[in-house]
């Protein structure tokens, strides 16, 4: 290119053409202040081959009066056709780079200086940056094409020039004296390597300072995965199993690695920060963050695994955004392979997402690669984020933990526990979730839709709506080593090899998942929408007079302040009236005025949707609501009987709602809640008896509304036990009982107008039945048929007649007694 007058002529024409658009300047250090020795030859070192970078350098040298890089240079008897070289050599005719070779020009210059003591040469490292630094750029469009650590193709370089070329910056660094390198007397080859290493470190440090650190491990890690012993073993087994060459199995493992691995770039993080800052301000009234300081304290020296609840696709972006804004490293995020869509998938991958298939079953090679990838992240200290619920909660409840990722984490820690692992629960609460209407359709029976790139237009359409505030609460961290010490005290003394899979692993992983879920619920953010939904959905007509709703909300706020659920739970500011105004402003309340005042109600469109927001905080009200429900049919109860019934029901409530208290803590909490209910006038204490208010009183209405928040859960319990008792011992399997429960719930929801599709959620019945088995109330026989404890009927009726209306109990018993007819009716 520059070795003949013709090539120099072509290069000059190219430079002039380039500068019809490009504008460049020198940054940091003036080219005139380089303290060059003009009597000695000058060479320019560019990091990698780029004709446009060379043209910009030539332009800046001409402008500054420096020697031009495209002109010949002489060092003693050595005559070089041009005064520049690329630290990374030009590719060969097949496009391959020789990573080990040194630039020929550098080798010849060092040899010339070594052979002639009077000769010297100066090498000036030069970096060309297209556009502003990512930290300074505010345009998301320009950030997409900003300089990064990734290797770019010709098309992307052309787009970069077109979009960012008007702000091109050139950095001249202090010259390196070749004579100083030669005087170390290391020999020619070692001197060349030393010069290369010196410039590589220089270019890397400068690039880090200008565009941010290289936080991607993809380029090196993926190739390293296939050399890990467990992956090599899986490759060999795959080759034998499929009767294919080992090289083909290795190529398959590499494809899996590239499919999985994230490709973090600082520019992508900055792009997302700029876009999301605009997005949050456009769609939300603000983001409230609580307790992040404890994460800032434990992050140094720990492998941090963020385990947020999962309510929206925005969860992926929101947490990374907040961590980045608060000076913490954004995590590598586990995302379903369904999100690896064109355009969106690439952006998420550069923002830290790594993709995983929904199931690993039947693919041991993929399993080995994925496990090794996560193990590498953990042992190298990269923060990681995954959702223990697996998918997004469509009901607003905490879903039962899926323990796959926890099991991988636990086994990785047993392989190498040098870096302490700490789980950080993160509760993300929305006053209005973006996918709310989609969830509503799915709750009503619509099939789950596959994600599509066109879903982004739905988000754009949502920009016109008001979504309130977002609350992000960081919960109590869980130190994995301490958890294992508690669950398996002797784990440190066991032989922990790479293939170590102890007998206690599954049970311990399940307990870990439950602990994470409880810690997430402890960090719940109670917001105005939650409380309004809780109050109105407890009424028979989904409506209350405004003054009555204000009293209910004031009561709930007072109770939660008197008996806090946990130190990590947060409450909304303001009184009941302020909460109503806030929710009204979000168009979630309908109203009707008359001469007596204003009635607030939920219309049909919002009634089901509001069950989602009620369920967010149902666990917080479960215990006081249970206590209140015992006074539905009983005017007075003793403390001992209350405690007996609460202890009997608590294991099932705890399993469904992930309540935080251990059974031995229950009596103290019961007393705290009873004292709070007495203080607010909802109960009256007479010696060891607790007495409800008069049915005609306002306090009785408040007590009844509080009790109704847990009624549907208690109804499901009674349905399952009634079906079981009517069927008889060892008649139904767990699966058959589960199906019958769903059918009965669907029928009762129609008969009693329960407008809550999650009432007949199959997973809730499944988990209740599992808990009955774990508690020893149910006993599967050899054929999987369920037998039950002799006292089950007595206990179920004793509780039900106190917490459920006679009409509802009769309906449940009738449907249970004639379940064949119920089955026929449900099918028809």
UniProtKB/Swiss-Prot annotation:
- Any idea where this protein resides? Cell inner membrane
Enzyme class, UniProt record, top EC level: transferase
Q: What does it catalyze?
A: sn-glycerol 3-phosphate + an acyl-CoA = a 1-acyl-sn-glycero-3-phosphate + CoA
What topology does the record note for this protein and the membrane?
Answer: Peripheral membrane protein
Highest taxon of source: Bacteria
Q: Which GO terms describe its molecular function?
A: glycerol-3-phosphate O-acyltransferase activity
To which pathway does this protein belong?
Phospholipid metabolism; CDP-diacylglycerol biosynthesis; CDP-diacylglycerol from sn-glycerol 3-phosphate: step 1/3
- Matching Pfam families, A to Z? Acyltransferase, GPAT_C
Which PANTHER family does this entry report, sorted A to Z? DIHYDROXYACETONE PHOSPHATE ACYLTRANSFERASE, GLYCEROL-3-PHOSPHATE ACYLTRANSFERASE
Per the record, the similarity remark reads: Belongs to the GPAT/DAPAT family.
Entry protein name: Glycerol-3-phosphate acyltransferase
> What organism is recorded for this protein?
Pseudomonas putida (strain W619)
